Amino acid sequence: MEQQKQHVIRAVRADEWEKVRGLRLDALRDPVASLAFLETYEQAAAKPDEFWQERAAGAAEGVDVAQIIAEAPDGRWDGSVSVFIEDVGTSDFLGQVVDVDQAHVVGVFVRPGQRGSGLTDALFEAALEWVWARQEPVLGRARLFVHEENERAAGFYRRFGFRASGLVVPKPDDPSAKEHEYVISRP
């Protein structure tokens, strides 16, 4: 936990799009990226600057999406988590109709050297603080999906208070693999 105290946990700013892109590309180079992300390094690297500029600007506005980062004293970003709102009646990433106003946690990444330091806890605390502070609509839960083979991540989510909902879906880019939905209810 001592490492975490050296980091500033905060939302991204619109002008930080290059760091948003850099951290995402680093995350997609991680050995477990194929379990944790639906996008490949090659797909992300091919996206134009405008994509990253829009992503950073949207997250900085914090209306329907937020990206929380862990910034080291030297300015390096050591982790990130993103959250977006899923409104009732919209379609989720699987094409299913959303039946409850909720948040969806995605893009969880902490650099290998910082794992176990408390950064993931700090990122999730800030992300869920953003979720629970939302007033319109008030969100009753947050959810995320975890690959069936990503036990380290699943263990963290359970320890943090998420519970398996029982919903199991095929991984969009590999239907032979399964992803489990985990949810946490508003305190």
Report the location of each language-model feature.
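Acetyl-CoA-dependent GNAT
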Residues: 22-113, 124-126, 130-136, 185-187
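A short beta-loop-alpha structural element at the N-terminal edge
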Residues: 8-22, 34
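Conserved glycine-rich acetyl-CoA-binding loop
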Residues: 107, 111-125, 136, 148-155, ...
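Short, low-complexity, intrinsically disordered N-terminal peptides in bacterial proteins
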Residues: 1-8, 187
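Conserved Rossmann-like nucleotide-binding pocket used by diverse enzymes
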Residues: 8, 104-106, 142
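C-terminal "cap" of GNAT-fold acetyltransferases
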Residues: 138-187
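Flexible, glycine-rich phosphate/dinucleotide-binding loops
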Residues: 18, 87-90, 151, 171
